[in-house]
Amino acid sequence: NLFQFAEMIVKMTGKEAVH
């Protein structure tokens, strides 16, 4: 699903943002 893909991106970007 497109939403799942977007959610994965958010998680990845979130990890990047944490650091």
From Swiss-Prot:
Gene Ontology biological-process annotations: killing of cells of another organism; lipid catabolic process
Location(s), subcellular: Secreted
Cofactor dependency: Ca(2+)
EC number, as in UniProt: 3.1.1.4
Disulfide bond is among the record's keywords: yes
Single GO term (MF): toxin activity
CC terms in the record's Gene Ontology section: extracellular region
Tissue expression notes: Expressed by the venom gland.
Source organism superkingdom: Eukaryota
Keyword Calcium included in the entry's annotation: yes
Cofactor binding note from Swiss-Prot or TrEMBL: Binds 1 Ca(2+) ion.
Catalytic reactions on record: a 1,2-diacyl-sn-glycero-3-phosphocholine + H2O = a 1-acyl-sn-glycero-3-phosphocholine + a fatty acid + H(+)
Keywords, comma-separated and alphabetical: Blood coagulation cascade inhibiting toxin, Calcium, Cytolysis, Disulfide bond, Hemolysis, Hemostasis impairing toxin, Hydrolase, Lipid degradation, Lipid metabolism, Metal-binding, Secreted, Toxin
PTM per Swiss-Prot/TrEMBL: Contains 7 disulfide bonds.
Note: This phospholipase A2 is distinct from phospholipases of Russel's viper venom reported from other parts of India.
Family: Belongs to the phospholipase A2 family. Group II subfamily.
Protein purpose: Snake venom phospholipase A2 (PLA2) that shows enzymatic, indirect hemolytic and anticoagulant activities. Interestingly, anti-PFIIc'serum completely inhibits anticoagulant activity, partially inhibits the indirect hemolytic activity, but does not inhibit enzymatic activity. PLA2 catalyzes the calcium-dependent hydrolysis of the 2-acyl groups in 3-sn-phosphoglycerides.
Protein name from the UniProt record: Neutral phospholipase A2 RVV-PFIIc'
Protein species of origin: Daboia russelii (Russel's viper)
